[in-house]
């Protein structure tokens, strides 16, 4: 019998006294959460943000984990000094790790452990603290905030302000729960609208004290406090665009030094609205279908499929990297599609009978019905298609992205969260139409759609990492910003020695969040009430 998820748990991470690996500055740490499923295999679940020049980081990113009472859930927290833009960790300095179980964290509520190196020796005086909270509340708070006349902390130019939100824990300490983006060179900043779960912000208690701090960002990590204020949700939710709630930003040190001190600026809350968000399971149980489409790279760089060196060569036991990636992801996602009929396309090959290069040809060669019956149907279409085509080029992604986007756009005509589209692209390398693909992704970010890219082989995947907006919002060549991060890129070879479920768990990890994010943004509800559906079964 499968384990039943008891609840969801939020994990907050902070570290102290990290090793300093940078010359002339401090380490730029990031924490990676790994999960152990069997034996010695660990797979990456999620990462925090990177904090520059800091040996005592408090990460604002929260890890959300399903808690299974009857399963020993082994976790590993790895801390790395990130000095480059690659997603690989092997080229970053390792600052230490901590292994524990989720049960240990939950039972102690806050667990502090020394960090150790791979050899088991102490990582200097470094330690890690993991705080756990059960998530019981799906209310979120939508904020719009700005400031005016902030103190200038920079000699050359103006302050680069950002906000931090802190809640008070039961032991009286402050825990950071949200950090806004930095607004560069501006004493009257307007921050982008943002949302924080009500539970994260104040444990759902409208009268619990919330502390907001305003800082001037500095590249060297020595961020200057501009000022702070304390409030409650009861006060904050009085805000409206026509009647903002305003707070003086007070710097205590300056107030004590100067009798004439008034404030260090004013923070204005223009919107503070509490709304209830549906969960991923609310949508799935409420009738939302995940529509799965596959795009396979048939460009010449894969090598002649008849040669054992080719990425398209099917080994005597019937597999290659393309098929393994397809099975891994497809087997998970097919359970969320009622008819299990999946369109499958190839790109970058010359196809019969004209032998023209095509970038969105159906692998079953039936343009009016490109659907394959289940994942097995896609595999069969792939196998029969391979000997009938000539691998060619270039590697263009935009046609197949735009193809799926047309269906996603049609689905937006419905007034409920009835359909969401997931495109899996399996490719061996360097993308040719990067500008067109950037534009296609930015356009698709406004649609009920996500894109998974699995890179097979050992090529340079830096362009793929660029499309995966983890380092910041992707922009089109015209400067338009993607309103959501909808691309997840994973190099297949990172999972060669991992359990067969690991690739799917990694690439699909962000899909629930992307589904919920889209439907909640557009205030779309599930087609059917989940409770009603459960009663009928």
UniProtKB/Swiss-Prot annotation:
Chain sites annotated for binding Ca(2+) 4: 154, 216, 218, 224
Organism: Homo sapiens (Human)
Domain C2: 1-115, 124-247
Subcellular location, record wording: Nucleus; Cytoplasm; Cell membrane; Cell junction
Protein name as it appears in the record: Copine-3
Example GO BP: cellular response to growth factor stimulus
Residues spanning the membrane: none
All residue ranges annotated as the VWFA domain in the record: 291-513
Pfam family, one: C2
Gene Ontology CC terms, in alphabetical order: azurophil granule membrane; cell junction; cytoplasm; cytosol; extracellular exosome; focal adhesion; mitochondrion; nucleolus
InterPro entries reported for this sequence: C2_dom, C2_domain_sf, C2B_Copine, Copine, Copine_C, VWF_A, vWFA_dom_sf
Family designation: Belongs to the copine family.
Keywords tagged on the record: Calcium, Cell junction, Cell membrane, Cytoplasm, Membrane, Metal-binding, Nucleus, Phosphoprotein, Repeat
């Amino acid at each position: 019998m499968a384990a039943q998820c008891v609840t969801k748990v939020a994990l907050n991470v902070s570290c102290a006294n990290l090793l300093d690996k940078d010359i002339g500055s401090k380490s730029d740490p990031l924490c990676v959460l790994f999960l152990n499923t069997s034996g010695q295999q660990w797979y990456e679940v999620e990462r925090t943000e990177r904090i520059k020049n800091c040996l005592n980081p408090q990460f604002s990113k929260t890890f959300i984990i399903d808690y299974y009472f009857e399963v020993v859930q082994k976790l590993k927290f790895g801390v790395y000094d990130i000095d480059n833009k690659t997603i690989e960790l092997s080229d970053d300095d390792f600052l230490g790790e901590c292994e524990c179980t989720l049960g240990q964290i939950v039972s102690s509520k806050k667990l502090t452990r020394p960090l150790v190196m791979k050899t088991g020796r102490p990582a200097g005086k470094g330690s890690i603290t993991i705080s756990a909270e059960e998530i019981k509340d799906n209310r979120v708070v939508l904020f719009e905030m700005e400031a005016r006349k902030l103190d200038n902390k920079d000699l050359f130019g103006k302050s680069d302000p950002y906000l931090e939100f802190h809640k008070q824990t039961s032991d009286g300490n402050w825990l950071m729960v949200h950090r806004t983006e930095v607004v560069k060179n501006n004493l009257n900043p307007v921050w982008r609208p943002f949302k924080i779960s009500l539970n994260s912000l104040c444990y759902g208690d409208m009268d619990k004290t919330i502390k907001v701090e305003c800082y001037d960002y500095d590249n060297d990590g020595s961020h200057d406090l501009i000022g702070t204020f304390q409030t409650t949700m009861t006060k904050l939710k009085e805000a409206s665009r026509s009647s903002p709630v305003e707070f003086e930003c007070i710097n205590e040190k300056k107030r004590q030094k100067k009798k004439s001190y008034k404030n260090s600026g004013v923070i204005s809350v223009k919107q503070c609205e509490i709304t209830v968000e549906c969960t991923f399971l609310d949508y799935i149980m409420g009738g939302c279908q995940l529509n799965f489409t596959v795009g396979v790279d048939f460009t010449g760089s894969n090598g002649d499929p008849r040669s054992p060196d080719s990425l398209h060569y099917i080994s005597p036991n019937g597999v290659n990297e393309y098929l393994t990636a397809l099975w891994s992801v497809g087997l998970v996602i097919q359970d969320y599609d009622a008819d299990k009929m999946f369109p499958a396309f190839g790109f970058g090959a010359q196809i019969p009978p004209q032998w023209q290069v095509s970038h969105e040809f159906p692998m079953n060669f039936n343009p009016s019905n490109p659907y394959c019956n289940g994942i097995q149907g896609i595999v069969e279409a792939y196998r029969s298609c391979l000997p009938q085509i000539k691998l060619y080029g270039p590697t263009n992604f935009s046609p197949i992205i735009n193809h799926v986007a047309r269906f996603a756009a049609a689905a937006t005509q419905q007034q409920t969260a009835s359909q969401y589209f997931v495109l899996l692209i399996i490719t061996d390398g360097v993308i040719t139409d990067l500008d067109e693909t950037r534009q296609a992704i930015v356009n698709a970010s406004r649609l009920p759609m996500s894109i998974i890219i699995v890179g097979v082989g050992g090529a340079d995947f830096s362009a793929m990492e660029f499309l995966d907006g983890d380092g910041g919002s992707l922009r089109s060549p015209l400067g338009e910003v993607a309103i959501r991060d909808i691309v997840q890129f994973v190099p297949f070879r990172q999972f060669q020695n991992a359990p067969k479920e690991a690739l799917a768990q990694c690439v699909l990890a962000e899909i629930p969040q992307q589904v919920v994010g889209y439907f909640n943004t557009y205030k779309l509800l599930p087609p059917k009430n989940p409770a009603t559906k459960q009663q009928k079964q």
